[in-house]
Amino acid sequence: MPRAAPPALLLPLLGLAAAAAADCPSSTWVQFQDSCYIFLQEAIKVESIEDVRNQCTNHGADMISIHNEEENAFILDTLKKQWKDPADILLGMFFDTDDASFKWFDNSNMTFNKWSDQEDDEELVDTCAFLHTKTGDWKKGNCEVSSVEGTLCKAAIPYEKKYLSDNRILISALVIASTVILTVLGAVVWFLYKRSLDSGFTTVFSAAHQSPYNDDCVLVVAEENEYDIQFN
């Protein structure tokens, strides 16, 4: 039987799982779903939340926005495992006095919240939102902070890049699959060809060493020759 395709041919498949990671700007970013995250681990002095936001925009991102429980949990887990674990993270959120609601700086919809139990009648002008890293709850606080321990930024993966990445993975998978199939077929054909050659060589070799007469024929011929000699 032909041997299976060498494992080395399958090694490129291992790279497909990591292909999506290349969608983030660099290895210092962490990807989750359709976004990339980076925690700028440096304390900075600020006069307003815009100073914090500028830290993110300088990296082509914006302050963090959170849209579901899974993302909230991911941020908490990553803060503990990979980043310094500050007590609170400033969220990219502001209070819009025009319609008396909180909004994200990145203009995404407010589809999720994790507010801790607080009084609803508190003054919300100049109020910012913070993620408490120990509990995962959000809490309101004064935007006039003098410093922050670090800035958490988020950048969405562009649609074009995601689309190209998905197609690149599909094309790579098809190419690798085709290569493996052709390799296996080639191995089968080569095996059958070698077996055919070996079989033909054995047949010729056997025929070359086979006498055209058996023992009985040789004995009869010898007796006839002896009889002819006696009567001549």
Swiss-Prot record:
Glycans are attached at N109. Disulfide bonds join C128-C143. Its main location: membrane. The lineage of its organism: Eukaryota, Metazoa, Chordata, Craniata, Vertebrata. It is found in: Membrane; Cell projection, Filopodium; Cytoplasm, Cell cortex; Cell projection, Microvillus. Potential multifunctional C-type lectin receptor that may play roles in endocytosis and phagocytosis as well as in cell adhesion and migration. The keyword Membrane applies. It is a single-pass type I membrane protein. Residues 23-168 are extracellular. GO terms for molecular function: carbohydrate binding; signaling receptor activity. Residues 32-152 form the C-type lectin domain. The chain crosses the membrane at residues 169-189. It holds the Pfam family Lectin_C. The keyword Cytoplasm applies. Residues 190-232 are cytoplasmic. Residues 1-22 form the signal peptide. This is CD302 antigen. Keywords: Cell projection, Cytoplasm, Disulfide bond, Glycoprotein, Lectin, Membrane, Receptor, Signal, Transmembrane, Transmembrane helix. CDD domains: CLECT. One of its GO terms (cellular component) is membrane. One of its GO terms (biological process) is phagocytosis.
